[in-house]
Amino acid sequence: MTDFKVIKIKTNAQNLYGWLALTNTDQPVGHIFMQVELDNKIKFMDAWVSDEFRRQGIFTALWETRWKYVKKNFEGYKAYAWALPMIINLLRKKGFDEGDTCVYMEKVIKNEG
């Protein structure tokens, strides 16, 4: 198990908040973001943990840090997230309600004249 800390970081993007997970040697091993939107909404954005540091509680620590920050500073706002199947149970435990299902689609862009 790796010792790590979570710090809040400043971003250059307006209304974007982020947290970084660092090892005790200050190696970045994870991050999580959120964006404050119009109409008192907060979009929970991407979270990432380096492959070699997964399954050590880093994602949960990042998520809980962001959650505590939101509860302290954004009472009355509505938080939402586009969730992968692996995170749905955590969101349910936090009281999130399921919305519509969304399907990921992709296409390689080609200059077809």
Residue ranges and their predicted role:
Residues 46-55:
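A short, internal acetyl-CoA/4′-phosphopantetheine-binding micro-motif in the GNAT/acyltransferase core
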Residues 70-84:
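Conserved GNAT acetyl-CoA-binding A-motif
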Residues 1-10, 111-113:
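Conserved N-terminal entry element of GNAT/NAT acetyltransferase domains
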Residues 83-103:
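Conserved active-site alpha-helix within GNAT-family acetyltransferase domains
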